[in-house]
Amino acid sequence: MRKTAKEAVRQRKIYMVLIIILIIVLSALGGGYYLLSQKKANEQKNVEQNSSSQTQAGQEQSSDTVEYRGETYKYNDHLSNYLFMGIDTRNPIDTYQTQEDAGQADAIFLVSMDRSTEKMKVLFIPRDSMTKIEIFNPSGKSLGESTDHINIQYAFGDGKQKSCELMKTAVSNMLDGLPIQGYCSMNMDGIAVITDFVGGVQITIPDDSLADVNPEYKKGAVVNITGENAEQFVRYRDTGKTQSALVRQERQKTFLQALVQKAQEKAAKDAGFVTDLYDSVQSYTVTNMGNDIFAKLLAASQNGITDTETVPGEGTQGKNFDEYHVDEDALSDLIISMFYEKI
């Protein structure tokens, strides 16, 4: 019995670290990805606005069944939906004490796995999306709901399970009550830890987006990225420029490709590498997902991601911060196409 338990723990570590690598890739690319997709979404906006859509008004006898654009749809109950978040804090999770420690969700995406086909879809949620979130005072008392950036919902929790639960609720509400079965968050210190653990990565700089910050980072230069400079390389953007997350996308992509390749090489040579890597990052991770979930996600990830979408909308400059205003009509279309089946 003891042997079986130990094997289960070890197996979960293997599943966990592989999914974490996926999380890192998607989290860091998430901000840039939605901006690229934004242009396509805006081009479709006029077409979508020609049709009226009233998601809530279309509710029928069953909460799983809706009338939409003259057709009847049923929620695909073969789906399991999991929320993944990249958090902008830098310390181990167990050191968090108050809201001030929690941080914000720097990247947010939903992985939807179809259990019948063992395939996955990914829905990116722009961090600056304006939506209903629940506000709390510093002592943890709810002050009701307010429309604000979805990424700060995480900050009203404890940086642990409460923050994740709040984000889970906010995302579900944004997606018209979509069920979310689990969550996993990792703060940005995890990237530095993994970078050092694999021994750093060598990268050819893809553009000049960091040249003004560090003259060594000129386009075409070959540099070594370690835990010390990984955060700057991956996360830096000029916050004085609106929607500047797009600029850092190529850097992120180049870094993450090199990181995953290095991790794969290490794992192929060292049977204990995966377990040790998991041990190095678990202090920066919060999840309510068990061994069986990670096993299924791993299997599904090997079949590839069949679809990637972004919550449709438009990025604008708000009074103080960037804002992303969701196109509710287009989002209704997307929810139906991703999570429902026509009957």
Predicted regions and their residues:
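Non-catalytic, solvent-exposed segments at the cell envelope interface
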Residues: R2-E7, R12, L18, G30-I343
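Core hydrophobic alpha-helical transmembrane segments of single-pass membrane proteins
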Residues: I21-L29
